Amino acid sequence: MSEPRSWLRRERRTQLTIVGHSPPHAGTSRRLRSTPDPSGRPPVLELLAHELVLRHAATRRDRIALVDGDTAITYGELAHRIAAIATGLQGRGVRKGDRVVVLIPMSPELYLVLLAVAAIGATAVFVEPKSTLSEIARAVRIARPRAFVAIPRAHALRAAFRDVGRVPLAVLVGPRLLARAAGAVALEDLEIEHDGAALPAVPMTADDPVLLTFSSGSTGAPKAATRSHAFLAAQHAAIERLVDRRSWRRSGRDPGRDDVDMSAFAIVVLSSLCAGVTAVLPPLGRGGVDDVDGAALVRVIDERGVSVLSGSPAFLAPIFDAARGRHLFGVRRVVSGGAPVPVAMCEAADEVLLPKGRFLVAYGSTEAEPIATIEASEVRRDTAAATRAGRGLCVGRPDPEIRLRLLAPAGGPLAIGPEGIDGLSVRDGEVGEVTVAGPHVNQTYYRNPAAVRATKVVDETGTVWHRTGDAGYLDGDGRLWIVGRIADTVRRGDRDYYPAAVEALAQELPGVERAALVADRAGGARLVVQAARGARDSRRITDHLAAAGVPVDAVAFARALPVDPRHRAKLDYRSIREEHSA
């Protein structure tokens, strides 16, 4: 598939000059003139990804940008340190177009490195810190990086895996003594050596790649999604629509107060920095969202004055539990996504967010986030009963910049015929594959043409559409309902049963904590249930489902159902099938 036409071909040179706390040139805050985009996308900010953040060093250099425990970094300090790291990387051979593997937990260092890499025109290859050693090695093989910037644990790979050991530049994020022992350069030394340096001037366009992020791999091998500067600018604009800062400021309810954000999503923290607000990094233990201390997080939220909170359901649940019986008075907006958000969490939101807080459910994927959103109040009022009746999870209406189609499910690549994209679409009310296009929808994968063929469709206008792999339908109010992954659909007889719809139905039973619908080898439907000890009654479960018209051939019980390592909330169907599909 040919690359999509560029919507901004004009090269320009980064004009930010930062020495100490010097501000960027005012001229970098221009917007694009309203030139029509050949793909139909609206104009976005002309600023490149790093400029979106560094512009704030000019107008609010003393404002706190990042808070990590007892450490606070201002926008001026952030710009100063980014310039030093960017100069150090460039001085050690990292050039425009190179790739830099970045394996750093959520911390100030993560954002310093990501933005420094962007500033020199290189591409950061973000690898989840909880990745296994083989997954890290695989990412290096795919990316063929010029540099490897990582925590000490990951540097052990340089001796164990040839591909990792061959990376020309190794930078260790941690103690300088460990760096010397590992034969690496310490990130701290890069900063010290180039303290006070000006930000390198590198020509680049908005279409240049700036970030590679891997899909979760829950439905196959992880794919490296390419994000350009334009993509990140559009995604930042979409996230700002969720957070809704403008209407909040216009309302005058908190005059003069700027938001303080806390998010367990790395990309949302980056967006907070683009917005020029304070981002408080959540205090997580080594286990990440598996190790959330809800009471400790509530204390930090109160002490730091957090007003916007976001994370997966697994991250938010302990916070909500700890806040019951009291209110998170300063929190005005909570956004949850990354995995299905239970109806019960939407119902619990009022108890902790009154009097002014609002809870928003966001639906998206690595390739397109956000796609659709719905307020918890609308879930409670309009859609919860249907979810409990097995009709799926309502994720709301599409983002204003998202174009959405529901395509007839297909097992392989799709080709556009004379009728265009609409010729592949299902009829109103039917279940189809959620397929999207827009300025914050990924258009390609790095070095993976097979994945591009399988998940991308180019229509008659040249627009690239992304097939999410999710099955869903639209209701009469234009809301999107998700019923499960197409690949995980269970065919029983002449009828399809969609996992998310059936699982939500089962989870309405008292004591049923989680459920997974899988096909067994005999062609039947098997429900694997994680339930409290006193609730492990297979007859009760099958009768409940049968009453809703869902026949299940067998019920199996598991102590805990496996979930994705990233958000700790999305079911790992592949592992469940391997263990329970006998």
Question: Which residue stretches match the model-derived regions?
Answer:
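Conserved AMP-binding A3 loop
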Residues: T74-G76, P203, D208-A237, T278
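Conserved AMP-binding/adenylate-forming core of the ANL superfamily
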Residues: L45, L54, D62-S107, Y111, ...
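Conserved pre-ATP/AMP-binding loop-to-beta segment of ANL
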Residues: R61-D62, V185, E191-F214, A221, ...
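Conserved AMP-binding/adenylation subdomain of ANL enzymes
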Residues: A122-T123, A234-S307, A322
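Gly/Ser/Thr-rich phosphate-binding loop
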Residues: V173, A186-D189, V277, S307-S310, ...
